[in-house]
Structures are given as C-alpha cells and as structure tokens.
C-alpha cells in the first residue's frame, strides 16, 4: 500500500505539433504516477489539447502522431485547463517527474505552456521536495559503463540506437503504438525497471546525483580534477561518453561549468585567441574543413547531467568505446601546465552571441524572471472569471504580461473581446498566416506527393489541409 507522504515518480510525455517548445504547441499529454519501484499507482492522465487560432500545425507532426487538428479540437481541453491539470500532477510534493529526453524537450514544453498561461514555469520542479530527471542519458551511461543485462538495438549505420521504440522492442516491451504519449510513457517505465534490475548500483547512483548541489560537490576547478561525462553532445563515435576536465565557472550563468573534452586535441585552446576560439566554436562541424574543433563543452548542473568520478569509466570500458586513456592523461597534464586557459575560456563565454531577438512574446520565457509582485498579479489573472479579465485594474512591472494577457484572452476566451480587440486579434492572425501560408502549403503538397500511395497518411494530410482552410476563412 502506498503512503501519501512517500516520494513518487511521475512519468510523462508530450506529443506536439512541432519540434520547437518555444513556438510549437502540445497536442497530447500522458502521465502516470508510480512508487519508488515503478509500480503504477493512481489513474493515468491522458489528454488532448486544443490549438490556438493563430497557429499552423505541422503536417509532419500529424503524420508522426496520427493526431489530426480536428481530433485535438473536438476531444481536447483548452490550453489553460490542459496545463492546469498537468501542473497539479507535477507539483504534488515529493514528486520526481521524468521522461525520455524530457529535460531538453518535454520540460521545455511544460515551461513554455505554463508561461503562456500565467503559471510559474519552474516551481513545480523544485518546491516541496520535488525534482526532475531524464532516462535518456541514464541509458546512454548504462550502455557505455555497464551494458550487461539490457539488450541494445543497432540502427542502420551500425551504431546503438537510443530511440525508445527500438530499445523497448529489443527488450521485449510491448510498444506497438510508438508516438502515442501513453505508449511512450509505459515503455519508459518498463525501461527504467529493466535498467534498475540489471544495474541497480549505477541506476541508484545517477538518481542520487540528479540534484545540482550534489553535482556541485564533484566539480573541482582549482585542481582540475577530471570527471566521466555522458551527453548526446559528445557524439555517437565515443558512445556519448568521455573524460572531461572542469576549468572554470561560466561568467554569467552560475549553473554552468566550462569543461574540456580530454579525448580531443586541446591545441586550439592553447593556440587560438579568444576571438578565434569563439568563431571556431560556433562554426558547424561540416564547415570546419581541416580545422580542429574546439573541445570545449558547457555542462549545466541544473539539467541533470551525467557526471561521475573519472574512475567510473574504467580503462577497459574506455578502450571498448574507442577512447585512448593515455592520450587523455597526457592532455590533462598539458592543460594543467597552462592555467592561463581559464581566463581565456571565461573570456570566450563572456562574448555576447548575436542572437536574433524575438519580438514574439510567446517565445520570451527566458528574457528574465518575473518579480514577486508580477507573480502575484499573474495568480490573480488565473483566478479571475474570464468575463472580468478585461476590467482587471492591475499594474504590471514586466512588459511581457500585457501582450500575454491579450493573447490568453483572445485564444481561450474570444467571446470576451470587444470590437476593437477583435479587429486587433483578426489582424494578428492574418499576419501570422500571410507570413507562413505559401511555404506551408508548398510543404503540404510535397508531403501529399511523397505519401500518395498511403491512404491513411493522405487522410491525415487532407484533415490538416481542411483545418488550415477553415482557419484562413
């Protein structure tokens, strides 16, 4: 029997209308709570989400998930209701929320959807003894460090595939409906059970290291103490694993540590100026030609990175994944002789990268935290009857809130707009469509040609076309 005050896991997954959490919208959510041994407790939560009128859903997404815009509109909740139910689950005390690639994707979907609907985008993941985790890098670590007890599928290029549908099938887990959110959640739970049963010490260690403060204890910049690191950024050639050395804290982000990959040639760091390093670091691999890449990587301690003492990666395991231990030790000795690289790398990350500033308020989550007064005002917005939102007399400090509030009303409660607001909203929707529709329709036509022999896919594409046509009219 599960006690209410015991820690639980909440496994979850979104299906979305595109791959960019800042701009794209959720289509489906599934989540289920388990106890610490991954036994399901309570009822699964499965919901669809309605689309806003100023958004064109990706036809590719519809083909992948099989969800049509009509299904989402008919069976879905409005976005404020949808995210409120999700937030209530994620916020239950002592919850560890997790998924598969959830830190980089699903958690971002949660944050942006909370932001658009005036819910604190971050508190659910840390208040009341809560935390977040992600199984993708745990599986990568298991594969590189302790592969016994789990079956590892190969893709067509001969590399291990970490796609959830490939792993689950290879390990005898039913996963006939991949890219259905609930099927993905069940597959993730079963893979968690599998890894924990096969490699309990490894599993429990990385689970205990999901907190920033624990990871902080591993980082020793003064002595340049090497660590074992697993990350998708390290590449599949080394099975996403390497020895790294932390050299400095990021100058403006106190959650990020600047590290050097010891398996790669450190010469560019020693020889190039800060400006040259900056240019090379942000040049695509394929555009470098014969130039050596810069083996520098930021590790964000608040994103549950896989870090462990260097000895965790044994010499034998390193050899198996193609890492030359002696070369790594030589590189470490060389870097320790050049403490001046620390200032150089701090300088490298002090250079402002020229990002296009987005003028779309929906995408401005990371432009800054809201003040306590604005947070309180946003709570009032959420609790106010939609019919009374126009009459709310609150001053906001943050310039994002007013346009967010207008969009919140227009998307979810269009009946509350006065005539002038209706004209403003219609103009906004028209601008969105006119900027995208030509390219969008061309893409849709290409997909119809590509899938002309597949009746099911053609039916989905026709549904998307009809939906977009209804919006445009």
Name each model-derived stretch.
Residues 208-288:
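Acidic catalytic cores of enzymes that act on phosphate-bearing nucleotides/polynucleotides
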Residues 1-42:
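Entry/capping segment at the start of metal-dependent catalytic domains
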Residues 76-94:
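Glycine-rich, N-terminal phosphate-binding loop and its surrounding beta-alpha-beta segment
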């Amino acid at each position: 029997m599960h006690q209410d005050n015991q820690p639980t896991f909440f496994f979850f997954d979104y299906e979305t209308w595109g791959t960019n959490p800042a701009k794209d919208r959720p289509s489906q959510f599934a989540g289920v709570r388990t106890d610490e041994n991954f036994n399901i407790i309570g009822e699964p939560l499965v919901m669809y989400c309605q689309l806003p009128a100023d958004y064109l859903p990706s036809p590719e997404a519809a083909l992948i998930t099989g969800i049509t815009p009509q299904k989402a509109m008919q069976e879905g909740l409005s976005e404020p209701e949808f995210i409120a139910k999700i937030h209530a689950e994620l916020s239950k005390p002592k919850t560890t929320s997790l998924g598969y690639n959830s830190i980089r994707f699903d958690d971002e979907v949660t944050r942006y959807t909370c932001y658009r609907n005036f819910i604190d985008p971050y508190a659910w993941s840390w208040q009341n003894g809560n935390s977040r985790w992600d199984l993708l890098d745990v599986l990568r670590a298991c594969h590189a460090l302790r592969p016994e007890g789990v079956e590892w599928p190969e893709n067509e290029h001969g590399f291990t595939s970490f796609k959830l549908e490939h792993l689950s099938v290879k390990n005898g887990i039913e996963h006939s409906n991949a890219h259905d959110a609930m099927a993905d959640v069940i597959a993730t739970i079963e893979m968690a059970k599998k890894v924990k049963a096969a490699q309990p010490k490894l599993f429990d260690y990385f689970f205990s290291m999901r907190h920033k403060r624990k990871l902080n204890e591993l980082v020793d910049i003064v002595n340049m103490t090497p660590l074992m690191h697993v990350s998708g950024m390290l590449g599949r050639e080394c099975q996403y694993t390497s020895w790294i050395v932390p050299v400095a804290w990021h100058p403006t982000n106190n959650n990020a540590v600047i590290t050097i990959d010891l398996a790669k040639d450190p010469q560019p760091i020693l020889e190039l100026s800060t400006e040259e390093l900056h240019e090379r670091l942000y040049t695509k691999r394929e555009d470098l030609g014969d130039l050596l890449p810069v083996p520098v990587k930021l590790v964000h301690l608040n994103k549950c990175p896989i870090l462990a003492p260097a000895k965790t990666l044994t010499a034998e395991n390193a050899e198996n994944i193609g890492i030359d231990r002696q070369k790594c030790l030589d590189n470490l000795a060389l870097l320790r002789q050049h403490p001046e690289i620390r200032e150089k790398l701090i300088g490298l990350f002090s250079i402002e990268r020229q990002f296009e500033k987005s003028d779309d308020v929906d995408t401005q989550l990371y432009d800054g935290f809201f003040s306590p007064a604005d947070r309180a005002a946003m709570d009032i917005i959420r609790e106010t009857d939609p019919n009374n939102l126009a009459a709310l007399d609150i001053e906001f400090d943050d310039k994002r809130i007013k346009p967010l509030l207008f969009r919140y009303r227009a998307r979810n409660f269009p009946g509350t707009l006065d005539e002038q607001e209706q004209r403003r909203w219609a103009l906004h929707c028209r601008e969105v469509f006119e900027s995208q529709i030509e390219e969008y329709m061309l893409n849709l036509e290409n997909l119809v040609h590509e899938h002309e022999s597949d009746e099911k896919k053609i039916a989905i594409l026709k549904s998307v076309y009809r939906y977009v046509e209804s919006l445009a009219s």
